Amino acid sequence: MLFALTRKDRTMLKYIIPLEPRTKKNSQQIITVHGRPIIIPSSVYKKYEKEAMHFIEPPKTPIEAPVNVQAIFYMATRRRVDLNNLLECVTDVLVNAKVLADDNSNIVVGHDGSRVYYDKESPRTEIYITEIKDE
């Protein structure tokens, strides 16, 4: 779901992904190709990424301006999670969905306000993308 808002000369996009948040690094597989080990995302993560993209409507052109990507994660259980790994998953999904041109530090300049909460009834991820204006 996409919501476009404008506040005080700042454009903001809001996405809601009504799926249990997943991390890329905690669900990896090691396979061997020509005798060399290679780490790939698990089928659980690939499924999450594919399903999450159904809830993301990209803008006409990917964002190339500096933005803050705030993500609020609502987990189904109270187990400990790594916020950095969750944020990496979000930015990867946004790049693959062509919302962001890239997830480098020239475009995603911060994750200010990102948090992890508990909501057993409705696990989800709320993503707020706010344009950063140079003062």
Regions found by a protein language model. Give the residues of each.
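Acidic, proline/glycine-enriched N-terminal capping motif
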Residues: 2-135
